[in-house]
From Swiss-Prot:
Its EC number is 7.4.2.8. This is Protein translocase subunit SecA. Its main location: membrane. It is found in: Cell inner membrane; Cytoplasm.
Amino acid sequence: MILFDKNKRILKKYAKMVSKINQIESDLRSKKNSELIRLSMVLKEKVNSFEDADEHLFEAFALVREAARRTLGMRPFDVQVMGGIALHEGKVAEMKTGEGKTLAATMPIYLNALIGKGVHLVTVNDYLARRDALWMGPVYLFLGLRVGVINSLGKSYEVVWKNPDLARKAIEENWSVWPDGFNGEVLKEESMNKEAVEAFQVELKEITRKEAYLCDVTYGTNNEFGFDYLRDNLVLDYNDKVQRGHFYAIVDEADSVLIDEARTPLIISGPSKESPSVYRRFAQIAKKFVKDKDFTVDEKARTIILTEEGVAKAEKIIGVENLYDPGNVSLLYHLINALKALHLFKKDVDYVVMNGEVIIVDEFTGRLLPGRRYSGGLHQAIEAKEGVPIKEESITYATITFQNYFRMYEKLAGMTGTAKTEESEFVQVYGMEVVVIPTHKPMIRKDHDDLVFRTQKEKYEKIVEEIEKRYKKGQPVLVGTTSIEKSELLSSMLKKKGIPHQVLNAKYHEKEAEIVAKAGQKGMVTIATNMAGRGTDIKLGPGVAELGGLCIIGTERHESRRIDNQLRGRAGRQGDPGESIFFLSLEDDLLRIFGSEQIGKVMNILKIEEGQPIQHPMLSKLIENIQKKVEGINFSIRKTLMEMDDVLDKQRRAVYSLRDQILLEKDYDEYLKDIFEDVVSTRVEEFCSGKNWDIESLKNSLSFFPAGLFDLDEKQFSSSEELHDYLFNRLWEEYQRKKQEIGEDYRKVIRFLMLRIIDDHWRRYLEEVEHVKEAVQLRSYGQKDPIVEFKKETYYMFDEMMRRINDTIANYVLRVVKVSEKDEKEAKEELGKIRLVHEEFNLVNRAMRRATEKKKKKDGLHSFGRIRVKR
């Protein structure tokens, strides 16, 4: 109650602000196009000078509203302006499907773009990034802003006038898409001023990635923004970076990007050398293990836990003395993955097998994700289980989660149709409140209480009866399923009944637009996995409103109430009539795992006979509470992973900051002095401080330096200070000699060398961290806090990595040999071939290793891109 009172208070404040915007807008109505453009230029100077956007919100929003009216023939409703205000304030605007989020975003985008630091509009796919940039482009161009678009495969564009001369003429002669004298709320296409529509057409022009980021507004996908950040931190020249900072971002479908995908990091990866035969061997071994005897399955956490009998059995079959010995950790992972593949990952639910490949099915949308792969060897374990060719496992070069990427922005906002149920997570993780924006027209969809059956068989029979009843009267039905397997089961049942229908699931997604377009037509029955809906509009056909509108039938509840609300939201858009009803059974995964006992008791008390459903508001409430419980569990998992990644994020920032320092430094003398000092002082302190002098151990610890560099004799030094000075001076003298030998190219050579050393150590560190994550999760079963354990281990590991980086740099700068420009070019080309992948779904990338491995074989030299180092 308090939350909704708070929402009302916010909306009341917004309503007053909208009233003020409306007043300014009415003053702008009489102004010429050229005057609006001049006002925009003046406003940009004001905002840019003081970087204070709040003060100019009313004028900016009114300008955008009038520009949209003239260039698009669309005037944002008051509720859309409210949504825009929420976005400007860094909140999540919950706006129902069909309420015009894309247009609402133009106002805060314009206002914040005036500051000059760049605004990012984040969409979920390339098509939407291009579509929205083109759709809203005329508004920004009219007001003097540049608009860029970033797509995958390195494609980047700028939105430009299709006919610049005609656009100029339209501005000079005061043309408007909205005709004079039209006072309605919505301007239909046939009533638009056709001449102005033609004049304000835009198109995409190819530009460089860097230019796209230099635009005032940049549209792109969450993946591409994240990958560009990671790629920027692998460059060998600062000028090759494309992003210019993280100022303000609006994330479309914020719940999907910031919550559902929060656990799946973006990764730049390369191939591992694990043999495919290992995965096949463990796929066979896993079949010998008996569930509940050798291992237990935790379906809630989606993990496998070996029993003592299982451990003994594994040690005997594999032929090791102790499965948990550090040297056997990889064998344990292989076994756990093989058991997961066999017992937790189901064909046609979690993945499909097509053309000899295992393709993941997105659990939230039901879409196929070709090219994406489970990480940590799990995908290979599934390939071994299914008997298809096994592709290489990958190792990580750079990684970041969406949580940590988007938290880098000075200001972050989001928009979606379903967010209120996740408000606590938005607040705790991102510091964003959720504001529920009212619909423009009242929502009249009727949501029925759930029908619960004892078995899935009874449930599906009743669903088919319900579909048949509505089909006979001509009411369109959209049936939502949670997997391909279930959509095809239902389809076969409808075929037996002779009910014509269309199926929309991951296997047929190419026809999605065509199928969805028909879903609201009279007599149409559509079966769809969760994929159908986001970004697609189901319009009612003639006579359908009179039949009650589109009827949504849910075949089971999802773990998240949000996903159910998205399914419901496909009916009753923009004030249309509609209905929704969920059919459930005690055998559904959600109820079976989390609540069948409670609901079963209720059914026994009420003496519900077989085949008879129970339908009661109290039962719907009980199921909602089960979902809340599961949402809490999932949030807890995400929070644990976030806390682990927060540790990694601080370390990542430290490493990337070090890279930037090296990229920007004009002279490395001071930096290398610090490194030599660190290398010398740590060793002198360890082996030759006080009375305990161990010259032999000191010699061994310095043996990685070029032979003959030090002439150590215990009698030469009267104190550890004298020894320290001798060692430091020898390193410094050799460095100066090497610097003179290489000549003017030395800075470039050293820069390439140091960057490659840092990148190589960071890659190895990330690989080790993945093993630590797995290990600390196993320790949690021994009552140890995994977060505390993770922090403790990674603190020492990171410290050790930084020490090794210093040692390696100190050693290699004294061994460097100048090489040709050709090698530099080749190294850059190889770096450019890096492919970027989205984890839990991991693609393999060979590029980075090839650059160095090929050169290692030449001349006994160790290669780091442009430079070679004598062994």
